[in-house]
Regions:
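Mid-domain alpha/beta scaffold segments of enzyme catalytic cores
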Residues: 1-262
Length: 262
């Protein structure tokens, strides 16, 4: 039996999958990816609505909702009302992705910080974990998390791209740390060095599809089934067998997303 995996962060709601979404999901399950969380946070709230709709029709898919830090400059009261409504949906298991992206700065940094704090507050209201997008902003992100994230609420640092020291610092904040296909890239040795610094009970894996296809699939549209390649590398760096890594990261995803009975 193929080891079961959980893709903790995917964007299969997007238009990149409109032509073959069912086939993509079938390939994922054939590869052992039995569960996934679809992140409804790209652009306007239609992404959140699509993600929730997808989760409603598939018992092994769940959704999150928020506005990506790239797009918070357009976060209107109308958008916010949609997020508040969807955040309470029973198939929504987290608030995100939210956070800070100082690499692209598509939205002003002050707007990013303000939105991050607001989405953490929304997560507290609905008692669901926060899914964080943090790029080149780890010090500011940790300062916000220390001040605003309630103990026990839960936080995922998705697509971790920080240093080993950053990984250690997030672990000290009791955050879960998720590794994407980037960890398989030749130039990503610092990421691989970070893997053993994350407590095993806080490790997650993801595709972030359709982006960041892992080796040996680079250059192709990423899809959930490709998480097997990320799992192989993370298992090696964590000192686990593939089967142990699959079981551990699946248990971790079920715990942080509060899906223990799923």
């Amino acid at each position: 039996m193929t080891a079961q995996l959980f893709d903790s962060h995917a964007h299969v709601d997007g238009p990149e999958f409109d032509a073959d979404r069912d086939e993509v999901l079938a390939r994922a399950r054939a590869a052992g990816v039995q569960r996934m969380v679809v992140i409804g946070a790209v652009g306007d709230p239609s992404s959140a609505e699509r993600s929730v709709a997808l989760a409603e029709r598939d018992p092994n898919i769940w959704a999150t909702v928020a506005t990506h830090p790239h797009d918070v400059k357009g976060l209107t009261p109308e958008w916010w009302a949609i997020h508040e409504r969807l955040a309470r949906h029973p198939r929504v298991v987290g608030i995100g992705e939210t956070g800070l992206d100082y690499y692209y700065d598509h939205s002003p940094r002050e707007a990013q910080r303000d939105a991050f704090v607001k989405f953490i507050a929304l997560a507290k209201q609905v008692d669901k974990p926060v899914v964080c997008h943090i790029r080149d902003a780890h010090d500011d992100a940790r300062a916000i998390l220390r001040e605003h994230l309630p103990a026990g609420l839960g936080c995922i640092i998705h697509c971790f791209t920080g240093t080993p020291d950053d990984a250690r610092a997030y672990a000290e904040l009791d955050c879960y740390v998720s590794f994407s296909g980037i960890v398989t890239y030749k130039t990503a040795q610092p990421l691989r060095d970070a893997v053993p610094l994350v407590p095993r009970e806080r490790l997650l894996i993801e595709t972030d599809c359709p982006y960041l296809s892992p080796v040996p699939k680079r250059g192709k549209r990423c899809e959930p089934g490709f998480v097997v390649h990320t799992a192989e590398v993370v298992a090696r760096e964590a000192g686990l067998s593939y089967e142990e890594l699959a079981a551990q990261t699946t248990a971790n995803a079920l715990r942080i997303y509060r899906l223990a009975d799923a």
